[in-house]
A protein has these predicted regions:
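Catalytic cores of Mg2+-dependent Asp-rich isoprenoid enzymes
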Residues: 1-137, 142, 146-256
């Protein structure tokens, strides 16, 4: 976020704090009943923030940027609904429809909030933002398979598993199946498709106003490329960008 002006950067940090607070509920090892209670409390908290019940710094900061950038309450509630899908174990070999809905809620809604903060919120930029959000979320899924296994999650959609002859919903058996790497390759093509669609829409958008989003896109394109090079036969090798790769992408973001 170094290429954002200070106020916009601080707004993004406030959104990040909200997302982190939301994710921490789903990713904890607490009982499901406790997670559901906390999610209910978070939904109430968002309603109270919009009703100016601001009794702590988190609420005050978030409300300041909600008002400044006219952020729609629906997007925050959509993010919470996405986390609920994890808590309720819906995201184990989901249908294509559920998978797409999940990607919108946990990534697309964040992208639309970001566009409001960037000051570039129109039909074209929203289309770009949603394509990009899908691509980023799918890349995250393909990167975090090992970690998601430990949380009892398997995000690869059922239709892709079926296409590769994987009929079980048991995560350990899915990962052991010799066709699982092919299923991951199939999902990576869906990420590529969304990146390509984002690139097409970007041609008719203001690149100057979307610098941060473009930098994120370039970063994740490279990450996906490295994931495909490693493959999914073994999940032991962690895939990350080197400091040089990050620096190069940052320089590219400044001059684009």
């Amino acid at each position: 976020m170094k290429i954002l002006e200070k106020e916009k950067k601080n707004a993004m940090f406030a959104i990040y704090a909200f997302c982190k607070k939301t994710d921490s509920i789903a990713d904890s090892f607490e009982l499901k009943s406790i997670k559901k209670k906390k999610i209910k409390e978070l939904r109430i908290e968002i309603e109270e923030i919009y009703n100016n019940k601001l009794n702590n710094n988190f609420r005050k900061t978030l409300k300041y940027y909600i008002d400044k950038y006219k952020l729609n309450k629906k997007y925050f509630l959509d993010i919470i609904k996405g986390v609920e899908m994890d808590i309720n174990d819906i995201m184990i070999c989901p249908s294509k429809k559920i998978f797409n809905l999940y990607c919108y809620r946990v990534a697309g809604a964040v992208g639309l909030i970001s566009l409001k903060i960037f000051g570039y919120y129109n039909k074209k930029s929203k289309s770009f933002g949603l394509y990009l959000a899908n691509a980023l979320q799918i890349t995250n899924i393909l990167r975090d398979i090992k970690e998601d296994k430990s949380m009892g999650r398997m995000y690869i959609p059922r239709y892709i598993l079926d296409k590769n002859g994987i009929k079980t919903n048991k995560i350990i058996l899915i990962l052991k199946n010799k066709k699982f790497p092919d299923a991951c390759k199939n999902l990576s093509k869906f990420a590529d498709l969304n990146f390509n669609n984002a690139d097409k829409v970007l041609k008719s958008c203001s690149k100057k106003k979307l610098k941060s989003a473009i930098l994120m896109m370039d970063t994740y394109k490279l990450l996906l490329k490295k994931l495909k090079k490693r493959g999914w036969d073994s999940l032991e090798e962690k895939v990350n960008l080197t400091k040089f790769e990050k620096f190069f992408l940052f320089l590219k973001g400044i001059v684009c």
